[in-house]
Amino acid sequence: MTALTDIVPPGVVTGDNLLKLLEHARDNGYAIPAVNCTSSSTANACLEAAAKNNSPVIIQVSNGGGAFLVGKSIKDANAAAAGSVALAYHVRAVAKYYGVPVVLHSDHCAKKLLPWFDGMLEADEEYYKMFGEPLFSSHMLDLSEEPDEENIDICVKYFKKMAPMKIWLEMEIGITGGEEDGVNNEDVDPEKLYTTPEQVYSVYEALSKIGPMFSIAAAFGNVHGVYKPGNVKLSPEKLLTHQEYTKEKIGSSLERPIFLVMHGGSGSTDDEIKLAVSNGVIKMNIDTDTQWAYWDGLRIFEAAKHDYLQGQIGNPEGDDKPNKKQYDPRTWVRKAEESMTARVALSMEKLGSVGTYPKSSEPGSQQVLGKKVNVVDGVISAVKGLLPH
Ligand SMILES: [Zn+2]
């Protein structure tokens, strides 16, 4: 196995490095968790999980997440784009300190939300002019509600705009059940919850003419959100049929020529996840489970410290004792973060990404652009350069 550390630098990865990262996942049979983030706090919790588990991570923002990030009081047509860009800048500013590859992605964009997508693309273009790479690594278009032909046409139109900046496109075809971001598929005909190999191939055919950097979320009985077990029949074995069909059509030497993405994975069994990954899933979305984890950390903290959280002064240790340490947001938000970090780590374990990006164990060394650089040596040679010869 080629070491990921030798081919992909730490920090936000875009373009060729992103392609290398996802090819590495495909070729080595693991997937990367993509976690919906709605704040700097939740983003940091993901970065912490990635750093502690030597794993790459995908941080993604939804339209609703973007609108929340800008501030709920702001009612502006560009609010969601502005908030999404703000999260991207936050992640860009801090990612390098965590020492692992980070993918910046935007989640489901239905037809009515295209102005949000356009706003983020504008930010990508601006960033590209300044730094020669886009702000985001990747964006998702979800036109699965539209007829297939229109879905694919719109994806082609956008992918042509994105390809020159080497931005990844994730698209969805077929119906994922449940409800997310205002799209409600709760009462859909169960037969329609499975994308066919022909549908997947038609996407491959259209997008591969433009570039290799795209992935497909094909429905295989997945449902957004958490449902009672038994209500959904997940069929990850169908994903292999997609791979085989396209492989045959294009005569590919790759066993799994298509990058697949798993949505609606909350509540899936470990075996279902494993089978999906072995059939070419390289990214799995996580939202519902990490939302719960974030809340659960706070819930447990409040239950344990309840009597210290009822007023600014006065607790079981005395009527005049201050409680500032307990109600400082850095205390209780941190509890939420720790709980979410642990949940993201669990997903990394299930998806097999743990340990794929080992940081150097040599003291004082860190990775810069994939090369191990000894910080002490670097400082010594810099100091030597300053001394008179
Ligand atoms: Zn989806």
Task: Annotate each language-model stretch with its function.
Residues A34-N36, I58-Q60, V103-H105:
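Short, conserved beta-strand segments within well-ordered enzyme catalytic domains
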Residues D16-H24, S40-N78, A82-G99, A110-R256, ...:
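Alpha/beta enzyme core
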Residues I32, M165-E172, I210-S215, G251-P257, ...:
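Flexible, glycine/charged-enriched surface loops at secondary-structure junctions
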Residues M1-P33, S252:
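N-terminal amphipathic alpha-helix/helix-capping segment at the start of soluble metabolic enzymes
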